[in-house]
Regions:
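Short, structured segments at the rim of ligand-binding sites
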Residues: 1-437
Length: 437
């Protein structure tokens, strides 16, 4: 297992360009299964989770041509459905949560889709019910092999449009149901659909392939089924989570950074939440400029009560950045309550921050109060392990600001979501190296 060795306390300086959005790319890659024609995708991040999915597509028989580091063509004109029932697929699919999204396209085009119980981050119970209830509403039959933890849906007579009210605005669930619906007979209406930019991008891509999806950007999607889809060219948005991570790096290390080509219109509440912590952000065209700040102060509510930062489905604040907000707050002036509503164990990494000297009170699995040091006390370096992608990058940010040299183990978790992170940090002046065990 590899580790990062980080010498903290150094200010960074320079310009960084965010990678393509991981969560969008997972959906877009699965959508190539909907057509036998060639699909070209640009700005695909070169990270573990994406590369695992590309490998699975290749094993399914998709012809893959790598144009450059972040661009590929895919052609799913000779799919090997037998792979879905192989021991290799049970191994490969179970290691990646995003693999669940191959089920919708396979069900739509071939009448069946199978998946082992997916893996990914261990950040609480993340149900798959929304996916399969949607498929059942479209006319599929569902089966689950408890012994082998294997899910399957089949629709030998095809899928048929239906109205459905999702019990949760699941991003991956919405994406999966959209991809199943585009080739269904008739009209599908999805109420309480997720409307994140990732879903908007998927819908725009499918429409460019010949689908008929309206209501894009709202929580009511109407899909008129078509008989087939064609090829297209698509470019993945910059990763809003990585953009928020770079803002956190700049704030904690008192650095002046410019983040290029951020797609401001798709950042939602991210800039405003950081500003509530006192972080200065400047819009320069489609870039974010963050000046070096000696200190920053959390804004209380107008009645003087303590600020609460909580997550919610889009257009609410993304849960993927709450751990970074928590770390940034440790050096702010003031107090903030972090309320993680959507997952019940994403805050459990705070014990590592407390070991570093942060003042954090874990109220329960969903809430933590952070009392900022106002730069009066620097975090102390320590040895720690990365429990998941977002906690991992948050601990890395804390280590970059800490006094002394920190070691972070289990960094494959960080590699799952962040492309070439140590070299990109070094280009800004960070003292970080990868140690292979």
């Amino acid at each position: 297992m590899a580790s990062f060795k980080i010498e903290g306390g150094h200010r960074l300086d320079g310009t960084i360009t965010p990678q393509g959005a991981k969560n969008e790319a997972l959906q877009i890659l699965c959508a190539v299964l909907l057509t036998p024609e060639k699909v070209t995708i640009h700005n695909i991040p070169d990270i573990i989770d994406i590369n695992k999915l590309i490998f699975i597509l290749g094993e399914l028989g998709v012809k893959i041509n790598k144009l450059d580091k972040n661009s590929y063509t895919f052609q799913a004109d000779n799919i090997n459905l037998e792979y879905l029932e192989s021991p290799e697929f049970k191994r490969d699919g179970s290691s990646l949560r995003g693999s669940i999204m191959i089920v919708g396209p396979l069900l739509a085009r071939f009448g069946k889709g199978y998946i082992p119980r997916p893996g990914g981050d261990k950040i609480g119970r993340r149900r798959l019910d929304t996916h399969f209830e949607g498929f059942i509403r479209l006319g599929a039959t569902f089966r689950y092999n408890k012994e082998e933890y294997f899910y399957g849906v089949e629709a030998p007579d095809g899928l048929f449009g239906s109205e459905m009210l999702l019990d949760e605005a699941s991003v991956t669930g919405t994406a999966n149901i959209i991809m199943a619906s585009v080739l269904a007979e008739g009209t599908t209406k999805i109420y309480n659909a997720a409307c994140e930019p990732y879903i908007q991008q998927l819908s725009k891509m499918l429409n460019s392939m010949g689908a008929n999806i309206t209501g894009v950007g709202s929580n009511l999607l109407v899909i008129e089924g078509v008989s087939s889809l064609g090829g297209c060219t698509h470019s993945v948005l910059p990763d809003m989570i990585e953009i928020g991570s770079w803002i956190g790096v700049a704030a904690m290390t008192q650095s002046e950074l410019t983040i290029k080509n951020v797609s401001w219109e798709n950042l939602g509440q991210i800039p405003s939440v950081f500003k509530k912590l006192g972080i200065q952000l400047e819009k320069r065209g489609d870039d974010i400029f963050i000046p070096s700040q000696e200190s920053y102060e959390i804004q209380n509510y107008i009645d003087g009560s303590v600020l609460t930062v909580s997550d919610a489905p889009w257009p609410g604040f993304t849960p993927d950045l709450l751990s970074i907000i928590l770390v940034v707050a440790t050096q702010a002036k003031g107090t903030v309550l972090i309320h993680q509503k959507m997952f019940e164990s994403r805050l459990f990494f705070v014990d590592k921050l407390i070991d570093m000297g942060a003042k954090v009170i874990l109220c329960d699995p969903h809430r933590a109060t952070v009392i900022g040091h106002n730069r009066q006390s620097q975090l102390k370096a320590t040895k720690m392990s990365s429990p998941d992608i977002r906690a991992g990058i948050s601990l890395l940010i804390a280590a970059l600001s800490a006094k002394g040299t920190s070691i972070i183990n289990n960094i494959e978790q960080i590699d799952r979501g962040y492309e070439d992170i140590e070299n990109r940090l070094r280009s800004l002046g960070a003292k970080i190296e990868r140690i292979e065990a």
